[in-house]
Amino acid sequence: MQFESLNENYIRTYDDIITKDLCDELISEFERNESQFDKQVLKDHRSFTQIALQQHSNWKPYADELQGVFNKCVWRYMQDCQVTDKMFPPQYAYEMYRMKRYEPNGVDEFHDHVDVGNHESAKRFLVFFLYLNEPQGGETDFPQRGISVIPKAGRLLMFPPMWTHLHAGRKVTGDTSKYIVGSYLHYI
């Protein structure tokens, strides 16, 4: 039996979707709101600090602005991947935006995983990772595909969250933390 690899991976990056100034503003707002921090630690799986943006009123203007930007990127992604209206859900919603900080402490990272692993997460169909700064290390790796996305302020990474897209958030190797905003599109 023969097969032909079509090499379509549905992984896309879009640079400069928000300004460096807005990236810096989001990072400053994060650091000013330590009382909103939610430390996520699961040994040998993940370690980072996050804020669920829509749970706090001070983040509403930022969440609204990001949603407008993300909406434009959905249509760009559909065009770039040749996804037609017949292939894409007519209605969808965003999962709560989470801003995450990965510190250069030798611990913070997100090991190899997929983002749909059970009935609850099965409503996810598209990943959004918006990088807010440019640390050393901290790449998002797709180990089975040999793809590594380097964090860059204002860069958006989009890809499917299913078993086909094993990925990892690698450790920061320099002195600067990595900051991202992440979300998913949901079937509704």
PLM feature segments, named:
Residues 1-156, 164-188:
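Fe(II)/2-oxoglutarate oxygenase catalytic core
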